[in-house]
A protein has these predicted regions:
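C-terminal outer-membrane beta-barrel translocator/porin domains of Gram-negative envelope proteins
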Residues: 341-343, 347-398, 404-407
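Exposed, low-structure sequence patches enriched in small/polar residues
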Residues: 389-392, 397-432, 516-518, 522
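Outer-membrane beta-barrel "beta-signal"
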Residues: 35, 515-529
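Signature for the C-terminal beta-barrel architecture of outer-membrane proteins
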Residues: 130-135, 148-357, 404, 423-425, ...
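Transmembrane beta-strands of outer-membrane beta-barrel proteins
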Residues: 26-34, 77, 89-91, 133-135, ...
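Flexible internal linker/loop segments at domain or repeat junctions
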Residues: 367-390, 428-460
């Protein structure tokens, strides 16, 4: 309760100062969010490799031992101090998530959580006089562009500076510097002598949106450098069957974001004849992404949109490098009763060589408030909380798929529905499964294999060309009042996993994998003000 008091005391002081004569207009908005989720089979396992019942579920692509039914709440509170049309400051508090009954999150009897109040965003917006330039400085939400699909490379809160200039109504330019990490390395091995040294991670973005009659196009590029100490210490452990696993330090208080750095910028498994400290890069990692996204609405009510992205990361060792691409095409038709659409996507996948790096598209972070329009169960279809999302992963990396959907399907006032049906498969070589599961602890040249993932569902889903799946969503939104909404989500996922690829360890004792379907029912209640 102490931190709650601090938040509302700050609000009172700000509003009180405004009354003393400052020409500042204070605005408050936010939302109370409640989620009641039931998920069955959220990790797609009935029994694990050892034949034991596998509990828990995947949420936002990471295994968590969570109950099948959960009740969760969260409060978003945004304060805006507006001095003029050209100057304003914003602070965005997030209180929760709080799982009902969980003491550590303040949801147990007494409700005294000690770490639930977080500053999600805090920035200043400024426009110089007589210029069409907009500057945003501070902790802010950044979402790279995507017209067909929410961008699968970066979508998160981050510290940085954004500058946008409009040359005219048709053409603009946006530049952005972001600093995801810095000064987090403790260097315990050297008594802290070189702590916080070479551990910065910086990204630079350039966007050039073009708006014409009936068409919008946005080419964009992002480049960056990551210090060799950013994710230290690197840890290698011996696993069953003489295989090895690797993990990195997690410099983020949001564990999911930190784990995504490992999963998004490095291979799922690699092989090397090196050992010890020489296994890793000692210089800055460099990275680049380039994309082209757009939509055509000239033939309204028919709309076509597309995305294309290429990305590469050089981690200083061939086996640690990663490069890949992604493309998607969407066509939809707007009617009085809904918006039916067809779409298809393709992400490049790994080949069968763990020594030449990864061929999957690299990414940085895509969890925070992600609205992935592909689905609301396998991925995060709505920017609302709840455990019933992201069981396939944070994005469809390493997959291809086709789908059909109907958005805004409505036959009565204040009630709308979304229906999605997706059929998808993996684009990774089936031989990679043997390295990921530890069945093959060495590559064909006798080099040791180090694996980040440990199974098809250890961090998101790693699907091969021998695997496929089907997902069905039916989601309904009822607007009970101007500020009150009820959202009911239902979802079902079936995976066809190739038994020859994933079914049994060859060198490790254990039963064959027993996988199961996943399904959910989730009710969200949102009061927005």
């Amino acid at each position: 309760m102490r931190k709650w008091g601090i938040v509302f005391l700050a609000v009172a002081l700000l509003l009180g100062d405004a009354a003393t004569g400052w020409a500042v207009d204070f605005k408050v908005k936010g939302s109370w969010q409640f989620a009641f989720d039931y998920i069955n089979g959220g990790n797609f396992m009935g029994k694990n490799r050892q034949g034991s019942h596998q509990i828990g579920q995947q949420w936002a692509a990471i295994h968590q031992k969570r109950d099948e039914f959960e009740a969760i709440q969260r409060l978003h509170l945004q304060l805006q101090a507006v001095a003029s049309e050209s100057l304003a400051g914003v602070v965005f508090f997030e209180i929760g998530e709080q799982r009902w009954g969980m003491s550590a999150q303040g949801g147990a009897l007494g409700a005294d959580g000690s770490n639930m109040v977080k500053v999600k965003q805090a920035y200043v917006d400024w426009m110089p006089p007589h210029a069409d330039l907009k500057v945003r400085m501070g902790l802010q939400g950044v979402r790279l562009p995507g017209f067909a699909l929410d961008n699968p490379v970066f979508n998160d809160d981050v510290a940085g500076i954004t500058a946008s200039y409009a040359f005219n109504k048709s053409f603009g330019l946006t530049a952005l510097w972001m600093r995801p990490y810095n000064d987090n390395w403790l260097d315990t091995a050297d008594n802290g002598v070189t702590a916080d040294y070479l551990d910065n991670f910086d990204l630079f973005v350039l966007l050039a949106p073009v708006s014409l009659d009936g068409m919008k196009i946005t080419p964009w590029a992002m480049a960056g450098g990551m210090g060799p100490n950013t994710l230290k210490p690197f840890t290698v452990r011996n696993a069953a069957g003489n295989s090895k696993t690797f993990t990195f330090n997690n410099p983020s208080s949001q564990a999911i974001d930190g784990l995504q750095m490992r999963d998004g910028l490095f291979p799922a498994a690699f092989s090397s004849g090196r050992g010890g400290a020489s296994l890793w890069n000692t210089a800055y990692s460099t990275m680049f992404w380039g994309g082209l996204t757009g939509e055509v609405t000239a033939f309204s009510p028919f709309r076509v949109s597309w995305d294309f992205i290429y990305g590469s990361v050089d981690n200083g060792r061939e086996y640690l490098n990663r490069q890949g691409w992604f493309g998607m095409l969407l066509g939809e038709y707007d009617t009085d009763w809904g918006v039916p659409g067809l779409y298809g996507w393709y992400f490049s996948g790994d080949d069968d060589n763990p020594h030449n790096g990864s061929e999957r598209l690299p990414y940085v972070a895509t969890t925070n408030n992600l609205t992935n329009s592909l689905s609301s169960f396998g991925y995060r279809g709505h920017p609302i909380m709840g455990g019933g999302k992201g069981v396939l992963g944070t994005n469809p990396n390493g997959t291809w798929g086709v789908g059909a959907r109907i958005k805004r399907l409505s036959f009565m006032d204040d009630l709308s529905h979304t229906l999605r049906v997706n059929y998808f498969g993996g684009t990774n070589d089936p031989k990679m499964a043997a390295y990921i599961t530890g069945r093959r602890p060495m590559d064909g040249a006798g080099r040791a294999v180090y694996r980040n993932n440990t199974d098809f569902n250890s961090f998101g889903t790693y699907l091969t060309r021998s695997d496929s799946g089907l997902e069905i969503n039916f989601d309904s939104t009822y607007k009970a009042a101007e500020n009150l909404s009820f959202i009911l989500e239902t979802g079902y996922i079936h995976l066809w996993l190739d038994e020859g690829t994933w079914g049994r360890y060859e060198n490790i004792a254990g039963d064959s994998l027993n996988y199961k379907d996943a399904w959910k029912v989730s009710l969200n209640v949102i009061y927005a003000f």
